[in-house]
Structure formats: structure tokens, C-alpha cells
Swiss-Prot record:
Oligomer status and interactors: Tetramer of two alpha and two beta subunits.
InterPro entries, alphabetized: aa-tRNA-synth_II/BPL/LPL, Gly-tRNA-synth_heterodimer, Gly-tRNA_ligase_asu
Entry's localization field: Cytoplasm
Taxonomic classification: Bacteria, Bacillati, Bacillota, Bacilli, Bacillales
Species this protein is from: Listeria monocytogenes serotype 4b (strain CLIP80459)
Gene: glyQ
Name assigned to this protein: Glycine--tRNA ligase alpha subunit
PROSITE patterns named among the record's database cross-references: AA_TRNA_LIGASE_II_GLYAB (PS50861)
Length: 296
């Protein structure tokens, strides 16, 4: 099964479970969780079921295309369901079966790995899912997003697209993966991986990046003053990516690192609170009569 077919199979399966299928969000981010389709939609009582592929940029993980499984940019297939179904783990195992992986014939383990994203004020109960000794998925029940307690709980399933495809195709090197017939992962992504790694570690203008972080922070704050959550959140994502670029260049000290993360977290918390309040003023329109409760 090539990678393109694998993604389509997951999309079809989760669509059958009631999830809407979205396209990736067009601002740089380090993980699918940071998309507003997860971060903002996990806030408040309104139900939400969605799936999407999210390119995720992690500058410090770039290896110029020389490492078989560490990348500047990888892909995640993200599934979020709120409220979390009681049978969410069974649904997940069903998705593996659709990919030709019979849980009865493989060693599938849920290894406790509670999750935290300090820069966005997020935390939850979590498990890594290991398939025959390889981590392929992160499974999380959100307890807190943007500093707000989550009720109802959102379940998040994050498939590592390249890792899962490597297992299915029995490839040791991600660049040898077949994306579709006649086209490899290398054909599509190798040059970008090499050039982005060069940029992240060698050629980025750190003075400019420092200025950009401050500029993005000010603009996020300014938009928040007008109650504009989504424009403000875009700039928080830009702050996060800019910080990651600075971190990759090694120009951020340990003390400064904590300060930068704190600045991003403060913005994210303000946005989460404002988003909740804005939906509350609208009467949480997606909540049905039997819907969820509000934050206490």
C-alpha cells in the first residue's frame, strides 16, 4: 500500500465514523495539535469530530535528508473527537485493520506517555501506540487546553504518517517510501529537506528572527484587544515557529528558552479564554439539547 492510498484509507475510515475531513491549516506549526482545528475546537462544550493531514515543521530535527527517519518536516494524520467515544481505542484498532494490520497477528501496545505542550498550556493523559516495537501513533485524552479544563474530554489520535508507511511498506529509509506509483518520498521532499535544514542550522538571519518574534507577539496582542481570536492565533503559531528556528540555531539560552515559551503560553491562554467567551456569547451554537456542560 503506497502512502497516498494509506492516507485515503484513513480518511475514508474516519469519515465513516462521523469525522469531517479537513485540509491542512496554512500556517507553520510543530504538530497537528497546534492547528486551530484541534487547539480551539477542544475548548468548550461544543461537539467536534474531524480528521486532517498536517505537515509539521520541527527545525531542530532536520538532518539534511541524511537521516533515514528524522526530518525537518514530517506529516501527521490527526483525528479529534469531542466528546470522546467510549470505544475510541476499538475504533483506532479498526483503522489499523483497514490498513491491513490485524491486531490479533501483531504486537500492539499502548505505552503510557502523558502528554504536555507547555508553550500552549496543554496537557492530557496519553499513550504511545507501538506496533511490533515501532511507535506509530500518539493517543491522548485532553485534560487542559490553553490553561482551561476540558469538558467534555477530547480524544486525539495522531498517526505518524511516515512511520506508519515505513512499517506498511517495510522500508528502513523514509525517502524510499512510495508516495504513489512511480513517485517516491525522495522525489517530492528530499531537496526541500536539505535546503530547509541548511536554512535552519546555517543561513537563517537570527537578528531578523528575533525581531519577527517580537513583531508577531505584538500583533497577536493587538488583535486580541479587538477580540479577533483567529488572526491572533495565527500570530501565536508564527511566534512558535520563529522560536523553533531560533532554538535550532542555538542562539537561545536555557533561561531565554523558558522565557520565550512563557510568552507564547501567555498568548495562547488569552486566546483560549477569549475563544471560550466568544462561543459562550453565541450560546455554544453547536451544542444540541443533550450537549455538554460548560467550564466550571
Amino acid at each position: 500500500m503506497n502512502l497516498q492510498t494509506m492516507i485515503r484509507t484513513l480518511q475514508d475510515y474516519w469519515s465513516e465514523q462521523g469525522c469531517i475531513m479537513l485540509q491542512s491549516y496554512d500556517v507553520e506549526k510543530g504538530a497537528g495539535t497546534m492547528s486551530p482545528y484541534t487547539f480551539l475546537k477542544a475548548i468548550g462544550p461544543e461537539p467536534w469530530k474531524a480528521g486532517y493531514v498536517e505537515p509539521s515543521r520541527r527545525p531542530a530535527d532536520g538532518r539534511y535528508g541524511e537521516n533515514p527517519n528524522r526530518l525537518f518536516q514530517h506529516h501527521q494524520f490527526q483525528v479529534v473527537m469531542k466528546p470522546s467515544p467510549d470505544n475510541i481505542q476499538e475504533l483506532y484498532l479498526g483503522s489499523l485493520e483497514k490498513l491491513g494490520i490485524n491486531p490479533l497477528e501483531h504486537d500492539i501496545r499502548f505505552v503510557e506517555d502523558n502528554w504536555e505542550n507547555p508553550s500552549l498550556g496543554c496537557a492530557g493523559l496519553g499513550w504511545e501506540v507501538w506496533l511490533d516495537g515501532m511507535e506509530i501513533t500518539q493517543f491522548t485524552y485532553f485534560q487542559q487546553v490553553g490553561g482551561l479544563e476540558c469538558f467534555p474530554v477530547t480524544s486525539e489520535i495522531t498517526y505518524g504518517v511516515e512511520r506508519l508507511a515505513s512499517y506498511i511498506q517495510d522500508k528502513e529509509n523514509v525517502f524510499d517510501l512510495e508516495w504513489t506509483e512511480g513517485i517516491s518520498y525522495r522525489d517530492i521532499f528530499f531537496q526541500a529537506e536539505f535546503e530547509n535544514s541548511t536554512y535552519a542550522f546555517e543561513t537563517s538571519n537570527t537578528d531578523m528572527l528575533l525581531t519577527l518574534f517580537d513583531t508577531y507577539e505584538r500583533e497577536a496582542t493587538r488583535q486580541m484587544q479587538d477580540g479577533l481570536v483567529f488572526p491572533a492565533y495565527d500570530y501565536v503559531l508564527k511566534c512558535s515557529h520563529t522560536f523553533n528556528l531560533l532554538d535550532a540555531r542555538g542562539v537561545v539560552s536555557v533561561t531565554e528558552r523558558a522565557q520565550y515559551i512563557g510568552r507564547i503560553r501567555n498568548l495562547a491562554r488569552r486566546i483560549a479564554k477569549t475563544f471560550y467567551e466568544s462561543r459562550e456569547k453565541l450560546g455554544f451554537p453547536l451544542v444540541k439539547e443533550e450537549g455538554g456542560k460548560r467550564h466550571e
